[in-house]
Amino acid sequence: MGEVQREKVAVIIGPTAVGKTKLSIDLAKALNGEIISGDSMQIYRTMDIGTAKVTKEEMDGIPHYMVDIKNPEESFSVAEFQERVRKHIREITERGKLPIIVGGTGLYIQSVLFDYQFTDDAGDAIYREQMEKLALERGVEYVHKKLQEVDPESAERIHANNVRRVIRALEIFHTSGEKMSDQLEKQENELLYDVSLIGLTMDREMLYDRINLRVDIMMDQGLLEEVEGLYNRGIRDCQSIQAIGYKEIYDYFEDRVSLEEAVSQLKTNSRRYAKRQLTWFRNKMDVTWFDVTDGEKTSEILRYIEGKLQLKSNNSK
């Protein structure tokens, strides 16, 4: 019997502000595709500006999934992301369309593409509560430093603001004696799909300028009011509020910094995050990179995907 044909999936990755959204929609139009967000924060309703969520106008009629599926006070795990996205891939494929995953959350995307197994192990609730208490009393950086001591690779990958994942990595080490990064490393070798993995990059200074400009635009669009709405709803120690763009403005509302300092910190954290994203993708995934410093490469990328996945686009003759 012949080998079972794997589902085709195109994946567009890259750092924040590099131009993934427009490219993905152009590709979806050309390739009869539907888009799955690979961003762990665009899942939250009412968190639109700070997550640079794709707008209805930008979607231009292309279906998007994994956007606005949770309330900000709800938690969300990589295991749930994996399950939901794999279901979307099946359903999109069954409709004769091409699933296109777009985003910047490396671990989440990797968990879908590779044969990751997530245990239902409840872990150690007492230890978890101790770490949560430490994070509240001594700050998230203190707990993140504890992770750096036992699992530096996970600490590099997980931002200090993502307290839930930092504590989960500590908990895995505490209960099993094994690093979270080592557990994942063992599972990374088998792709489950026929994948075309595209990465966008650009000159670092240009990218950083774009990030700074994006933050200014977010403030003009009403980021302060968006975060104030969450703050006034009493949303505090939730996973969603650890996101870059929200934590910094929360510091302002809690009188820890001035608004100017909050915006400056947001720009700094966004640039650092972009750098971490690029490091992750380059170290962890077999990506074909396209430099878009001098402008978009839509036609070139389209030809590459057609060849890699043996597809015909609507632009093909």
UniProtKB/Swiss-Prot annotation:
<comment type="subunit">
    <text>Monomer.</text>
</comment>
<feature type="binding site">
    <location>
        <begin position="14"/>
        <end position="21"/>
    </location>
    <ligand>
        <name>ATP</name>
    </ligand>
</feature>
<protein>
    <recommendedName>
        <fullName>tRNA dimethylallyltransferase</fullName>
        <ecNumber>2.5.1.75</ecNumber>
    </recommendedName>
</protein>
<dbReference type="InterPro" id="IPR027417">
    <property type="entry name" value="P-loop_NTPase"/>
</dbReference>
<dbReference type="GO" id="GO:0052381">
    <property type="term" value="F:tRNA dimethylallyltransferase activity"/>
</dbReference>
<dbReference type="GO" id="GO:0005524">
    <property type="term" value="F:ATP binding"/>
</dbReference>
<keyword id="KW-0819">tRNA processing</keyword>
<dbReference type="GO" id="GO:0006400">
    <property type="term" value="P:tRNA modification"/>
</dbReference>
<keyword id="KW-0067">ATP-binding</keyword>
<dbReference type="InterPro" id="IPR018022">
    <property type="entry name" value="IPT"/>
</dbReference>
<feature type="site" description="Interaction with substrate tRNA">
    <location>
        <position position="128"/>
    </location>
</feature>
<feature type="region of interest" description="Interaction with substrate tRNA">
    <location>
        <begin position="39"/>
        <end position="42"/>
    </location>
</feature>
<keyword id="KW-0808">Transferase</keyword>
<feature type="binding site">
    <location>
        <begin position="16"/>
        <end position="21"/>
    </location>
    <ligand>
        <name>substrate</name>
    </ligand>
</feature>
<dbReference type="InterPro" id="IPR039657">
    <property type="entry name" value="Dimethylallyltransferase"/>
</dbReference>
<dbReference type="Pfam" id="PF01715">
    <property type="entry name" value="IPPT"/>
</dbReference>
<comment type="similarity">
    <text>Belongs to the IPP transferase family.</text>
</comment>
<comment type="function">
    <text>Catalyzes the transfer of a dimethylallyl group onto the adenine at position 37 in tRNAs that read codons beginning with uridine, leading to the formation of N6-(dimethylallyl)adenosine (i(6)A).</text>
</comment>
<keyword id="KW-0547">Nucleotide-binding</keyword>
<feature type="site" description="Interaction with substrate tRNA">
    <location>
        <position position="105"/>
    </location>
</feature>
<keyword id="KW-0460">Magnesium</keyword>
